[in-house]
């Protein structure tokens, strides 16, 4: 089982898809990594040679922010928005959508399940 950036890649998936299991690497990044490493994107993870794995690992270490570093940067930027009290930061703090979506109805995923308010009936 190939282990890259602290993540065990799934054995039976193509390497192009397997690399997307690493936080911070999507499909486009995965394709560009494989192109630079000159590894066929249709090879299964279990069929990779040690040389291929080391090439991929080296490219990811040099050029990409992945896993813990990427998560830390994301949380720090959200924390910074909340500290400077900008609109996006306040929306993060209140658990509401950030990008102008309506909240009178919908937005259930972001706001959580319904909370019944006592004494609120239509007159």
Curated annotation (Swiss-Prot):
Compositionally biased region (Basic residues): 101-123
Keyword Ubl conjugation (UniProt): no
InterPro entries the record matches: Rbsml_uS13_C (IPR027437), Ribosomal_uS13 (IPR001892), Ribosomal_uS13-like_H2TH (IPR010979), Ribosomal_uS13_bac-type (IPR019980), Ribosomal_uS13_CS (IPR018269)
Region feature Disordered, mapped onto this chain: 92-123
Any single GO BP term: translation
Cell compartment(s), UniProt: Plastid, Chloroplast
Example of a GO MF term: structural constituent of ribosome
Pfam families: Ribosomal_S13 (PF00416)
Disulfide bridges in this chain: none
Gene3D superfamilies for the chain: 1.10.8.50, 30s ribosomal protein s13, domain 2 (4.10.910.10)
Keywords assigned: Chloroplast, Plastid, Ribonucleoprotein, Ribosomal protein, RNA-binding, rRNA-binding
PROSITE patterns: RIBOSOMAL_S13_1, RIBOSOMAL_S13_2
One GO term describing the cellular component: chloroplast
HAMAP family (alphabetical): Ribosomal_uS13 (MF_01315)
Record's subunit section: Part of the 30S ribosomal subunit.
Task performed by this protein: Located at the top of the head of the 30S subunit, it contacts several helices of the 16S rRNA.
Protein name from the UniProt record: Small ribosomal subunit protein uS13c
Phylogenetic classification of the source organism: Eukaryota, Cryptophyceae, Pyrenomonadales, Pyrenomonadaceae, Rhodomonas
């Amino acid at each position: 089982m190939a282990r890259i950036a602290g993540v065990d890649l799934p054995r039976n998936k193509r390497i192009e898809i397997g690399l997307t299991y690493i936080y911070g690497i999507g499909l486009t990044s995965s394709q560009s990594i494989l192109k630079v490493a000159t590894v066929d994107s249709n090879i299964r993870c279990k069929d990779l040679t040690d040389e291929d794995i080391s090439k991929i690992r080296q490219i990811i270490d040099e050029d990409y922010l992945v896993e813990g570093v990427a998560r830390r940067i994301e949380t720090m930027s959200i924390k910074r928005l909340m500290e400077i009290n900008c609109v996006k930061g306040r929306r993060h703090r209140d658990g509401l959508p950030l990008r102008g979506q309506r909240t009178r109805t919908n937005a259930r995923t972001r706001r959580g399940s319904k909370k019944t308010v006592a004494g609120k009936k239509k007159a």
